[in-house]
Amino acid sequence: MLPWRRNKFVLVEDEAKCKAKSLSPGLAYTSLLSSFLRSCPDLLPDWPLERLGRVFRSRRQKVELNKEDPTYTVWYLGNAVTLHAKGDGCTDDAVGKIWARCGPGGGTKMKLTLGPHGIRMQPCERSAAGGSGGRRPAHAYLLPRITYCTADGRHPRVFAWVYRHQARHKAVVLRCHAVLLARAHKARALARLLRQTALAAFSDFKRLQRQSDARHVRQQHLRAGGAAASVPRAPLRRLLNAKCAYRPPPSERSRGAPRLSSIQEEDEEEEEDDAEEQEGGVPQRERPEVLSLARELRTCSLRGAPAPPPPAQPRRWKAGPRERAGQAR
């Protein structure tokens, strides 16, 4: 990584032997002080000269910028479906299945890199199908989806982790992945480092959430109080430091595409009408009627028209009492 792209400081041990500051070629502070005190023995203090000479020593320290992500050479053994997301011993059955299927001599040689965003694995050898310059695609396991990691108890060199895969229709599948390392202490160190990275990322995520919630509450208080001034924008330094590796990935398949929201057609029509009135300069009188008609049309359905009512039958004439008496005569 280029030195001007690095931003984190990692303190390294002090230099074992620091060079003395020199005044001129062949002359140093310590030699000048020792010669001066030897010439004037009455000025000698009770402390030894070595202790007095430490005052003039340089206190420089070595600093390493942005420590590189640790990389391990592993053999990927495979994965198996599991029903347990976390807990002691939740990977024993899955690792047993993977070990019985692959064995100690199997697996694919890969480079495992543990970074702030999770685990990244890339094959070491070049793929024959991709040509001489082609490489197999790398596999990334995001930190928020890793639910558990451990060094297996029965196989100390095996490092296993449970990953939450997302299938179609938002279905979740838990799979246990296992890799084989060269030494048992490397597997334990890798598990410990991954847990520390996840804990630090989750702490940063909670801190940023608290900051955003507090800012939202202040904004709501100002709006409720009727204050004209709004909350000032966050400084640039805070915005740059607000990058968190524990941000949960979006649920969409594209991973990063913004969610689509519903379009308010009435508001857009009102805005367009306002713009036309401002451009034309003459208000339209039929605007309320047009809007009411449009609302009524939206409520109408596309079903067929209702069946017409049956035709009215002619009313039969009934004879009155006089006609009945005449008919009886």
Curated annotation (Swiss-Prot):
It comes from the Eukaryota. Disulfide bonds: none annotated. Residues 320-329 have a biased composition (Basic and acidic residues). Residues 245-329 are annotated as: Disordered. InterPro entries: Adapter_Engulfment-Domain (IPR051133), FAM43A/B_PTB (IPR033930), PH-like_dom_sf (IPR011993), PTB/PI_dom (IPR006020). It holds the Pfam family PID_2. Residues 264-279 have a biased composition (Acidic residues). Transmembrane segments: none annotated. PANTHER family: PHOSPHOTYROSINE INTERACTION DOMAIN-CONTAINING FAMILY MEMBER, PROTEIN FAM43B. Belongs to the FAM43 family. This is Protein FAM43B. The gene is FAM43B.
